[in-house]
Amino acid sequence: MSSLRGLGNIARRWRELNGVSYWKGLLDPLDVDLRNNIINYGELSQAAYTGLNRERRSRYAGSCLFSRKDFLSRVDVSNPNLYVITKFIYAMCTVSLPDAFMIKSWSKAAWSKQSNWMGFVAVATDEGKEVLGRRDVVVAWRGTIRMVEWMDDLDISLVPASEIVRPGSADDPCVHGGWLSVYTSADPESQYNKQSARYQVLNEIKRLQDMYEHEETSITITGHSLGAALATINATDIVSNGYNKSCPVSAFVFGSPRVGNPDFQKAFDSAPDLRLLRIRNSPDVVPNWPKLGYSDAGTELMIDTGKSPYLKAPGNPLTWHDMECYMHGVAGTQGSNGGFKLEIDRDIALVNKHEDALKNEYAIPSSWWVVQNKGMVKGTDGRWHLADHEDDD
Protein backbone atom coordinates (compact mmCIF):
# COMPACT_ATOMS: atom_id res chain seq x y z
CA MET A 1 0.00 0.00 0.00
CA SER A 2 1.14 3.56 -0.38
CA SER A 3 2.29 5.50 2.67
CA LEU A 4 -0.16 6.28 5.47
CA ARG A 5 0.17 9.92 4.45
CA GLY A 6 -0.95 8.94 0.95
CA LEU A 7 -3.97 7.16 2.40
CA GLY A 8 -4.93 10.18 4.51
CA ASN A 9 -7.93 11.26 2.41
CA ILE A 10 -9.44 7.80 2.02
CA ALA A 11 -11.34 7.97 5.32
CA ARG A 12 -13.19 11.05 4.09
CA ARG A 13 -13.66 10.00 0.46
CA TRP A 14 -13.92 6.20 0.61
CA ARG A 15 -17.44 5.95 -0.84
CA GLU A 16 -16.42 8.04 -3.85
CA LEU A 17 -13.13 6.17 -4.25
CA ASN A 18 -14.88 2.80 -4.09
CA GLY A 19 -17.22 3.79 -6.89
CA VAL A 20 -20.50 5.03 -5.44
CA SER A 21 -20.75 7.26 -8.54
CA TYR A 22 -19.00 4.78 -10.84
CA TRP A 23 -15.74 6.76 -10.58
CA LYS A 24 -17.12 9.60 -12.73
CA GLY A 25 -14.59 12.40 -13.06
CA LEU A 26 -11.86 10.43 -11.30
CA LEU A 27 -10.27 8.34 -14.06
CA ASP A 28 -8.91 10.66 -16.76
CA PRO A 29 -6.79 12.18 -15.32
CA LEU A 30 -6.53 9.70 -12.48
CA ASP A 31 -7.35 11.18 -9.08
CA VAL A 32 -4.38 10.94 -6.70
CA ASP A 33 -6.46 9.54 -3.83
CA LEU A 34 -7.90 6.95 -6.18
CA ARG A 35 -4.36 5.98 -7.21
CA ASN A 36 -3.55 5.30 -3.58
CA ASN A 37 -6.80 3.42 -3.08
CA ILE A 38 -6.19 1.21 -6.12
CA ILE A 39 -2.63 0.45 -5.02
CA ASN A 40 -3.90 -0.32 -1.51
CA TYR A 41 -5.96 -3.18 -2.94
CA GLY A 42 -3.39 -3.99 -5.61
CA GLU A 43 -0.82 -4.75 -2.92
CA LEU A 44 -3.22 -7.18 -1.26
CA SER A 45 -3.75 -8.84 -4.63
CA GLN A 46 0.03 -9.03 -5.14
CA ALA A 47 0.36 -10.52 -1.64
CA ALA A 48 -1.68 -13.51 -2.78
CA TYR A 49 1.01 -14.15 -5.43
CA THR A 50 4.00 -13.50 -3.22
CA GLY A 51 2.77 -15.79 -0.46
CA LEU A 52 2.33 -18.82 -2.71
CA ASN A 53 4.76 -21.73 -2.50
CA ARG A 54 5.75 -22.31 -6.14
CA GLU A 55 8.46 -24.91 -5.52
CA ARG A 56 7.14 -28.17 -6.95
CA ARG A 57 9.92 -30.12 -5.22
CA SER A 58 8.40 -29.13 -1.89
CA ARG A 59 5.68 -31.24 -0.31
CA TYR A 60 3.95 -27.91 0.39
CA ALA A 61 3.87 -26.70 -3.23
CA GLY A 62 0.62 -24.86 -3.86
CA SER A 63 0.16 -23.91 -0.20
CA CYS A 64 0.89 -20.62 1.55
CA LEU A 65 4.45 -19.99 2.68
CA PHE A 66 3.45 -18.09 5.81
CA SER A 67 0.96 -18.23 8.67
CA ARG A 68 -2.01 -15.87 8.80
CA LYS A 69 -0.62 -14.03 11.83
CA ASP A 70 2.55 -12.85 10.10
CA PHE A 71 1.46 -13.02 6.48
CA LEU A 72 1.03 -9.33 5.59
CA SER A 73 4.37 -8.34 7.08
CA ARG A 74 6.19 -11.35 5.61
CA VAL A 75 5.05 -10.51 2.07
CA ASP A 76 6.09 -6.87 2.62
CA VAL A 77 2.74 -5.14 2.29
CA SER A 78 3.46 -1.45 2.88
CA ASN A 79 1.04 -1.02 5.79
CA PRO A 80 0.54 -4.48 7.29
CA ASN A 81 -1.24 -3.14 10.38
CA LEU A 82 -4.28 -1.91 8.45
CA TYR A 83 -5.78 -5.40 8.10
CA VAL A 84 -5.77 -8.70 9.91
CA ILE A 85 -6.25 -11.91 7.96
CA THR A 86 -9.17 -13.92 9.32
CA LYS A 87 -9.26 -16.81 6.85
CA PHE A 88 -7.19 -18.46 4.15
CA ILE A 89 -9.05 -19.62 1.02
CA TYR A 90 -8.43 -23.00 -0.60
CA ALA A 91 -9.68 -24.09 -4.00
CA MET A 92 -9.75 -27.14 -6.22
CA CYS A 93 -11.00 -27.68 -9.74
CA THR A 94 -12.97 -30.50 -11.33
CA VAL A 95 -12.20 -29.54 -14.93
CA SER A 96 -8.86 -29.74 -16.70
CA LEU A 97 -6.77 -26.58 -16.31
CA PRO A 98 -3.23 -25.72 -17.47
CA ASP A 99 -0.41 -25.89 -14.92
CA ALA A 100 -0.41 -22.10 -14.65
CA PHE A 101 -3.58 -22.28 -12.55
CA MET A 102 -2.89 -24.96 -9.96
CA ILE A 103 0.52 -26.01 -8.61
CA LYS A 104 0.92 -29.69 -7.80
CA SER A 105 3.73 -31.01 -5.62
CA TRP A 106 6.05 -33.66 -7.02
CA SER A 107 6.38 -35.13 -3.53
CA LYS A 108 4.66 -38.40 -2.65
CA ALA A 109 3.97 -36.84 0.75
CA ALA A 110 2.26 -33.74 -0.68
CA TRP A 111 0.16 -31.68 1.73
CA SER A 112 -2.77 -31.99 -0.71
CA LYS A 113 -3.31 -33.78 -4.00
CA GLN A 114 -6.25 -31.58 -5.03
CA SER A 115 -6.25 -28.21 -3.30
CA ASN A 116 -4.30 -25.00 -3.73
CA TRP A 117 -4.11 -21.97 -1.51
CA MET A 118 -6.12 -19.35 -3.39
CA GLY A 119 -6.03 -16.19 -1.27
CA PHE A 120 -7.46 -14.78 1.93
CA VAL A 121 -10.18 -12.83 3.70
CA ALA A 122 -9.09 -9.90 5.86
CA VAL A 123 -10.79 -7.20 7.90
CA ALA A 124 -9.63 -3.73 8.86
CA THR A 125 -8.08 -3.45 12.31
CA ASP A 126 -9.06 -0.60 14.62
CA GLU A 127 -6.08 1.33 13.24
CA GLY A 128 -7.16 0.44 9.72
CA LYS A 129 -10.71 1.58 10.40
CA GLU A 130 -9.40 5.02 11.36
CA VAL A 131 -7.32 5.29 8.18
CA LEU A 132 -9.93 3.79 5.83
CA GLY A 133 -13.03 5.40 7.35
CA ARG A 134 -14.97 2.17 7.93
CA ARG A 135 -14.53 -1.49 8.80
CA ASP A 136 -13.43 -2.77 5.40
CA VAL A 137 -13.66 -6.50 4.68
CA VAL A 138 -11.31 -7.58 1.87
CA VAL A 139 -11.22 -10.76 -0.19
CA ALA A 140 -7.99 -11.18 -2.19
CA TRP A 141 -7.91 -13.91 -4.84
CA ARG A 142 -4.70 -15.41 -6.18
CA GLY A 143 -4.24 -15.50 -9.93
CA THR A 144 -2.34 -17.60 -12.45
CA ILE A 145 1.33 -18.37 -11.99
CA ARG A 146 3.25 -16.04 -14.26
CA MET A 147 2.75 -17.75 -17.63
CA VAL A 148 0.32 -16.37 -20.20
CA GLU A 149 0.59 -19.28 -22.64
CA TRP A 150 -2.40 -20.84 -20.87
CA MET A 151 -4.72 -18.87 -23.15
CA ASP A 152 -3.89 -21.25 -26.01
CA ASP A 153 -4.69 -24.34 -23.94
CA LEU A 154 -7.84 -23.40 -22.04
CA ASP A 155 -11.37 -24.34 -23.02
CA ILE A 156 -13.47 -21.16 -23.31
CA SER A 157 -16.89 -22.79 -22.92
CA LEU A 158 -19.57 -20.84 -21.10
CA VAL A 159 -21.69 -22.55 -18.44
CA PRO A 160 -24.84 -21.36 -16.63
CA ALA A 161 -24.23 -19.16 -13.58
CA SER A 162 -27.59 -19.81 -11.93
CA GLU A 163 -25.93 -20.48 -8.55
CA ILE A 164 -24.21 -17.12 -8.64
CA VAL A 165 -26.81 -14.80 -10.15
CA ARG A 166 -30.17 -14.45 -8.44
CA PRO A 167 -33.20 -15.65 -10.46
CA GLY A 168 -34.83 -13.12 -12.73
CA SER A 169 -31.93 -10.69 -12.89
CA ALA A 170 -31.06 -11.67 -16.48
CA ASP A 171 -32.17 -14.05 -19.20
CA ASP A 172 -29.35 -16.62 -19.33
CA PRO A 173 -26.26 -15.48 -17.41
CA CYS A 174 -23.25 -17.68 -18.13
CA VAL A 175 -19.61 -17.58 -17.07
CA HIS A 176 -16.39 -19.29 -18.08
CA GLY A 177 -16.54 -22.93 -16.98
CA GLY A 178 -12.97 -23.00 -15.68
CA TRP A 179 -13.40 -19.91 -13.49
CA LEU A 180 -16.65 -21.28 -12.09
CA SER A 181 -15.14 -24.68 -11.35
CA VAL A 182 -12.31 -23.15 -9.30
CA TYR A 183 -14.90 -21.08 -7.41
CA THR A 184 -17.45 -23.83 -6.72
CA SER A 185 -15.65 -27.20 -6.67
CA ALA A 186 -15.70 -29.22 -3.44
CA ASP A 187 -14.99 -32.76 -2.28
CA PRO A 188 -16.33 -34.15 1.02
CA GLU A 189 -13.19 -36.31 1.29
CA SER A 190 -10.83 -33.34 0.93
CA GLN A 191 -9.09 -31.91 3.98
CA TYR A 192 -9.11 -28.37 2.59
CA ASN A 193 -12.07 -28.35 0.22
CA LYS A 194 -14.92 -30.03 2.01
CA GLN A 195 -16.39 -26.61 1.28
CA SER A 196 -15.83 -24.88 -2.03
CA ALA A 197 -13.82 -21.68 -2.16
CA ARG A 198 -17.16 -19.99 -2.72
CA TYR A 199 -18.67 -21.09 0.57
CA GLN A 200 -15.44 -20.57 2.49
CA VAL A 201 -15.64 -16.91 1.48
CA LEU A 202 -19.40 -16.43 1.78
CA ASN A 203 -19.51 -17.96 5.26
CA GLU A 204 -16.62 -15.79 6.41
CA ILE A 205 -18.28 -12.70 4.94
CA LYS A 206 -21.46 -13.55 6.87
CA ARG A 207 -19.51 -14.11 10.09
CA LEU A 208 -17.72 -10.76 9.80
CA GLN A 209 -20.90 -8.92 8.84
CA ASP A 210 -22.58 -10.31 11.95
CA MET A 211 -19.56 -9.45 14.11
CA TYR A 212 -19.52 -5.82 12.96
CA GLU A 213 -23.24 -5.34 12.40
CA HIS A 214 -23.28 -2.12 14.46
CA GLU A 215 -20.40 -0.55 12.52
CA GLU A 216 -20.18 0.97 9.06
CA THR A 217 -18.71 -1.69 6.80
CA SER A 218 -17.73 -2.25 3.19
CA ILE A 219 -16.72 -5.33 1.23
CA THR A 220 -13.90 -5.03 -1.29
CA ILE A 221 -12.81 -7.84 -3.60
CA THR A 222 -9.52 -7.80 -5.48
CA GLY A 223 -7.50 -10.05 -7.76
CA HIS A 224 -5.24 -10.22 -10.79
CA SER A 225 -5.57 -12.44 -13.88
CA LEU A 226 -7.45 -15.59 -12.81
CA GLY A 227 -7.86 -13.89 -9.44
CA ALA A 228 -9.57 -10.98 -11.18
CA ALA A 229 -12.06 -13.35 -12.81
CA LEU A 230 -12.74 -15.03 -9.45
CA ALA A 231 -13.13 -11.60 -7.83
CA THR A 232 -15.73 -10.61 -10.42
CA ILE A 233 -17.74 -13.79 -9.84
CA ASN A 234 -17.37 -13.49 -6.06
CA ALA A 235 -18.50 -9.86 -5.93
CA THR A 236 -21.54 -10.66 -8.08
CA ASP A 237 -22.37 -13.65 -5.89
CA ILE A 238 -22.14 -11.67 -2.64
CA VAL A 239 -24.58 -9.01 -3.82
CA SER A 240 -26.92 -11.22 -5.85
CA ASN A 241 -27.43 -13.54 -2.88
CA GLY A 242 -27.59 -10.88 -0.19
CA TYR A 243 -24.43 -11.63 1.78
CA ASN A 244 -23.53 -7.94 1.92
CA LYS A 245 -26.66 -6.97 3.90
CA SER A 246 -26.86 -3.78 1.79
CA CYS A 247 -23.33 -2.59 2.56
CA PRO A 248 -21.46 -1.50 -0.58
CA VAL A 249 -19.43 -4.09 -2.49
CA SER A 250 -16.60 -2.97 -4.77
CA ALA A 251 -14.13 -4.96 -6.83
CA PHE A 252 -10.74 -3.73 -8.02
CA VAL A 253 -9.45 -6.17 -10.63
CA PHE A 254 -6.20 -6.10 -12.59
CA GLY A 255 -5.45 -7.71 -15.95
CA SER A 256 -8.74 -9.58 -15.93
CA PRO A 257 -9.73 -11.99 -18.65
CA ARG A 258 -13.37 -11.76 -19.61
CA VAL A 259 -15.69 -13.59 -17.26
CA GLY A 260 -19.14 -14.05 -18.75
CA ASN A 261 -21.64 -13.49 -21.53
CA PRO A 262 -23.72 -10.34 -22.15
CA ASP A 263 -26.48 -11.66 -19.87
CA PHE A 264 -23.96 -12.00 -17.05
CA GLN A 265 -22.93 -8.39 -17.70
CA LYS A 266 -26.61 -7.41 -17.58
CA ALA A 267 -27.01 -9.21 -14.26
CA PHE A 268 -23.92 -7.49 -12.92
CA ASP A 269 -25.13 -4.05 -13.99
CA SER A 270 -28.54 -4.59 -12.40
CA ALA A 271 -27.16 -5.63 -9.00
CA PRO A 272 -27.56 -2.91 -6.34
CA ASP A 273 -24.58 -1.76 -4.27
CA LEU A 274 -22.12 -3.43 -6.69
CA ARG A 275 -19.23 -1.65 -8.40
CA LEU A 276 -16.21 -2.96 -10.29
CA LEU A 277 -13.15 -1.15 -11.63
CA ARG A 278 -11.18 -3.08 -14.25
CA ILE A 279 -7.60 -1.83 -14.46
CA ARG A 280 -6.23 -2.72 -17.87
CA ASN A 281 -2.74 -2.24 -19.28
CA SER A 282 -2.94 -1.30 -22.97
CA PRO A 283 -0.36 -3.83 -24.29
CA ASP A 284 -1.59 -6.69 -22.06
CA VAL A 285 -3.27 -9.39 -24.18
CA VAL A 286 -5.12 -11.15 -21.34
CA PRO A 287 -8.03 -8.66 -21.00
CA ASN A 288 -8.87 -9.25 -24.68
CA TRP A 289 -9.56 -12.94 -24.02
CA PRO A 290 -11.87 -14.80 -24.55
CA LYS A 291 -13.45 -12.93 -27.43
CA LEU A 292 -16.47 -14.71 -28.91
CA GLY A 293 -19.54 -14.78 -26.68
CA TYR A 294 -18.02 -12.78 -23.83
CA SER A 295 -18.63 -9.25 -22.58
CA ASP A 296 -16.83 -6.94 -20.13
CA ALA A 297 -18.47 -6.01 -16.83
CA GLY A 298 -17.86 -2.89 -14.77
CA THR A 299 -15.92 0.32 -15.41
CA GLU A 300 -12.55 0.35 -17.17
CA LEU A 301 -9.40 2.25 -16.23
CA MET A 302 -6.85 2.06 -19.04
CA ILE A 303 -3.16 2.51 -18.26
CA ASP A 304 -0.14 2.10 -20.55
CA THR A 305 3.13 0.94 -19.03
CA GLY A 306 4.70 1.40 -22.46
CA LYS A 307 4.84 5.12 -21.64
CA SER A 308 6.99 4.59 -18.54
CA PRO A 309 10.58 5.81 -18.98
CA TYR A 310 11.69 3.33 -16.31
CA LEU A 311 10.69 0.10 -18.05
CA LYS A 312 12.41 -1.78 -20.86
CA ALA A 313 10.81 -1.20 -24.25
CA PRO A 314 8.78 -2.66 -25.71
CA GLY A 315 8.44 -5.20 -22.90
CA ASN A 316 6.91 -8.64 -23.36
CA PRO A 317 3.66 -10.46 -22.53
CA LEU A 318 4.94 -11.36 -19.04
CA THR A 319 5.88 -7.81 -18.04
CA TRP A 320 2.75 -6.32 -19.64
CA HIS A 321 0.65 -8.63 -17.46
CA ASP A 322 2.75 -8.45 -14.27
CA MET A 323 0.93 -7.16 -11.19
CA GLU A 324 3.79 -4.97 -9.97
CA CYS A 325 4.01 -3.40 -13.42
CA TYR A 326 0.28 -2.73 -13.22
CA MET A 327 0.74 -0.84 -9.94
CA HIS A 328 3.68 1.06 -11.45
CA GLY A 329 1.35 2.07 -14.28
CA VAL A 330 -1.33 3.22 -11.84
CA ALA A 331 1.24 5.28 -9.95
CA GLY A 332 2.39 7.11 -13.08
CA THR A 333 -0.39 7.25 -15.66
CA GLN A 334 -1.27 10.73 -16.93
CA GLY A 335 -4.46 9.78 -18.70
CA SER A 336 -5.31 8.86 -22.26
CA ASN A 337 -3.59 11.88 -23.80
CA GLY A 338 -0.74 12.26 -21.33
CA GLY A 339 2.65 10.73 -20.76
CA PHE A 340 3.99 9.15 -17.59
CA LYS A 341 5.00 10.74 -14.29
CA LEU A 342 5.08 9.02 -10.92
CA GLU A 343 2.49 10.83 -8.80
CA ILE A 344 3.03 8.39 -5.93
CA ASP A 345 6.39 7.66 -4.35
CA ARG A 346 6.39 3.98 -5.27
CA ASP A 347 9.74 2.21 -5.44
CA ILE A 348 10.59 1.37 -9.06
CA ALA A 349 12.59 -1.67 -7.87
CA LEU A 350 9.26 -3.42 -7.24
CA VAL A 351 8.66 -3.95 -10.96
CA ASN A 352 11.56 -6.42 -10.92
CA LYS A 353 10.16 -8.32 -7.94
CA HIS A 354 9.05 -11.26 -10.09
CA GLU A 355 10.05 -10.16 -13.60
CA ASP A 356 12.79 -8.45 -15.65
CA ALA A 357 10.97 -5.22 -16.48
CA LEU A 358 13.19 -2.40 -15.22
CA LYS A 359 15.86 -0.85 -17.42
CA ASN A 360 19.33 -2.20 -16.67
CA GLU A 361 20.66 1.26 -15.83
CA TYR A 362 18.81 1.12 -12.50
CA ALA A 363 20.96 -1.86 -11.40
CA ILE A 364 18.12 -3.90 -9.88
CA PRO A 365 18.32 -7.70 -10.30
CA SER A 366 15.44 -9.40 -12.05
CA SER A 367 13.03 -11.64 -10.09
CA TRP A 368 14.76 -10.63 -6.88
CA TRP A 369 12.06 -11.65 -4.39
CA VAL A 370 12.82 -15.14 -3.06
CA VAL A 371 12.44 -16.78 0.32
CA GLN A 372 15.84 -16.83 2.04
CA ASN A 373 17.88 -19.72 0.64
CA LYS A 374 14.69 -20.86 -1.12
CA GLY A 375 13.48 -22.24 2.20
CA MET A 376 16.56 -24.37 2.86
CA VAL A 377 17.79 -24.34 6.46
CA LYS A 378 20.82 -25.94 8.10
CA GLY A 379 20.04 -28.34 10.90
CA THR A 380 22.00 -29.00 14.07
CA ASP A 381 23.48 -32.04 12.36
CA GLY A 382 25.05 -29.78 9.73
CA ARG A 383 22.77 -30.99 6.94
CA TRP A 384 20.47 -28.81 4.87
CA HIS A 385 16.76 -29.50 4.50
CA LEU A 386 13.71 -27.75 3.08
CA ALA A 387 11.58 -25.92 5.67
CA ASP A 388 9.29 -23.72 3.59
CA HIS A 389 6.02 -23.87 5.49
CA GLU A 390 4.58 -22.24 8.61
CA ASP A 391 1.69 -23.94 10.37
CA ASP A 392 -1.38 -21.73 10.46
CA ASP A 393 -2.42 -20.93 14.04
Swiss-Prot record:
Q: Does the keyword Coiled coil apply?
A: yes
One annotated Gene Ontology cellular component of this protein: cytoplasm
Annotated catalytic residues: S225, D284, H321
Gene Ontology MF terms:
phospholipase A1 activity
Localization, UniProt: Cytoplasm
EC assignment: the record states 3.1.1.-
Q: What this chain does, per the record?
A: Acylhydrolase that catalyzes the hydrolysis of phospholipids at the sn-1 position.
Q: What is this protein called?
A: Phospholipase A1-II 1
